[in-house]
Amino acid sequence: MNAPVNPKKLIKGALGDWEVVIGMEIHAQVTSRSKLFSGASTAFGAEPNDNVSLVDAAMPGMLPVINRECVAQAVRTGLGLKAQINHRSVFDRKNYFYPDLPQGYQISQYKSPIVGEGEVLVDLPEGETIRVGIERLHLEQDAGKSLHDQHPSLSFVDLNRSGVALMEIVSKPDLRSAEEAKAYVTKLRTILRYLGTCDGDMEKGNLRADVNVSVRRPGEFLGTRCEIKNVNSIRFIGQAIEAEARRQIAILEDGGVIEQETRLFDPNKGETRSMRSKEEAHDYRYFPDPDLLPLEIDDAFIDELKTELPELPDTKKARFVAEYGLSAYDATVLVAERASADYFEAVARGRDGKAAANWVINELFGRLNKEGHGIEDSPVSAEQLGAIIDLIADGTISGKIAKDLFEIVWSEGGDPRAIVESRGLRQVTDTGAIEAAVDQIIAANPDKVVQAQAKPTLLGWFVGQTMKATGGKANPAAVNALLKAKLGIE
């Protein structure tokens, strides 16, 4: 049985409410130059079967040798997930036949994984924060790739991925909606990228998700789960969960029974389809790999890796709120990518943190999203954006001119201060010039003057006209003060 669920997360069926229960198995490719048990390269994009050693091809007599860096990356990830690091773990053979698995088994970890229980804090769009338990993290080999579209009657096998190190990160069934699942994968990917243990590139297959979905009436025992294999985008994860939950609800409300099975998500049809019956652990006949000794990790190794860990998203977010006075939402947006957080800090250094966050989130991120660029490709450097903020702060330019200046720097580059001088963008602070513009507008609009005196909110119209008359260069505070004095508005 379980605690009451948030009604907003329930799914409406024809015969009442249902709760969806979701667990995730994330396969994250370890960032390393060579494979888990061989010295073959892990470089992406090589010609088929170029990055294959005799070990990867399972040639007789070839023995696996553990890659120390892959072990270190798994431990770093465990530390980043606030998880237990197991001092002793065992590699097992997971036996099954598939053409792209040349050994006839996969080297994985079953009963004794390298990392035990941990947790991930996940911020949801509506402001709620949930804790998602991590059940385990284990190391295993990736399989090769079967290609069925190269020839009308033949299939081919590419073993470049065979033997590449994967971390399988298994969550507890703590997720209760498609949105929660998407937010969880997004946060997990952020942590991996901060740590440098996986690049999280789903398009290249470096991060893949198996999604376990079941439904139940609120408060009842867990239902029968189905596993949706190899979902390769966060958007598809959400769609797959919603489609599978609806399928199961329809079956149960029709009096049917859910069969435990493995399914695939078809994004074109927006539905899941049966792949095979779900295997149990005994189907794989796990047993310890006789070619590999148990993996033993001492405290000194773990402590050394701890000292090298970067500041992680949750800690960085808390610091941004405390140090720069940011809202929790703005801090969450800024720490979503390590490069974005670093960019913000470079802009905010020695400046007003809230102003820096406003410019980075609204102006820079808005333009980057519009152009389809990442922060690494920004044509406006942190130094340039900081200079624009300085020009506003010291009264050289107005906020409106600053946006025009941002566009110039984005399109043409250059030093913001030099651009202001060369293009005559300095704001007008000469009260005589501003007063002349104000007097002219008041004289030309006597009806508006009467209306503004009766309804002070119309002062904004006069401000706009004055800014227009001065090419946006008038100091807004000076314009406001003059207009209030001349119109007799307090």
From Swiss-Prot:
Its EC number is 6.3.5.-. Transmembrane segments: none annotated. SMART domains: GatB_Yqey. Keywords: ATP-binding, Ligase, Nucleotide-binding, Protein biosynthesis. One of its GO terms (biological process) is translation. It catalyses: L-glutamyl-tRNA(Gln) + L-glutamine + ATP + H2O = L-glutaminyl-tRNA(Gln) + L-glutamate + ADP + phosphate + H(+); L-aspartyl-tRNA(Asn) + L-glutamine + ATP + H2O = L-asparaginyl-tRNA(Asn) + L-glutamate + ADP + phosphate + 2 H(+). InterPro entries: Asn/Gln-tRNA_amidoTrfase_suB/E, Asn/Gln-tRNA_Trfase_suB/E_cat, Asn/Gln_amidotransferase, Asn/Gln_tRNA_amidoTrase-B-like, GatB, GatB_C_1, GatB_Yqey_C_2, Gln-tRNA_amidoTrfase_suB_CS. PROSITE patterns: GATB. GO terms for molecular function: asparaginyl-tRNA synthase (glutamine-hydrolyzing) activity; ATP binding; glutaminyl-tRNA synthase (glutamine-hydrolyzing) activity. It comes from the Bacteria. Pfam families: GatB_N, GatB_Yqey. Allows the formation of correctly charged Asn-tRNA(Asn) or Gln-tRNA(Gln) through the transamidation of misacylated Asp-tRNA(Asn) or Glu-tRNA(Gln) in organisms which lack either or both of asparaginyl-tRNA or glutaminyl-tRNA synthetases. The reaction takes place in the presence of glutamine and ATP through an activated phospho-Asp-tRNA(Asn) or phospho-Glu-tRNA(Gln). Belongs to the GatB/GatE family. GatB subfamily. Heterotrimer of A, B and C subunits. This is Aspartyl/glutamyl-tRNA(Asn/Gln) amidotransferase subunit B. It comes from Methylobacterium nodulans (strain LMG 21967 / CNCM I-2342 / ORS 2060). The lineage of its organism: Bacteria, Pseudomonadati, Pseudomonadota, Alphaproteobacteria, Hyphomicrobiales.
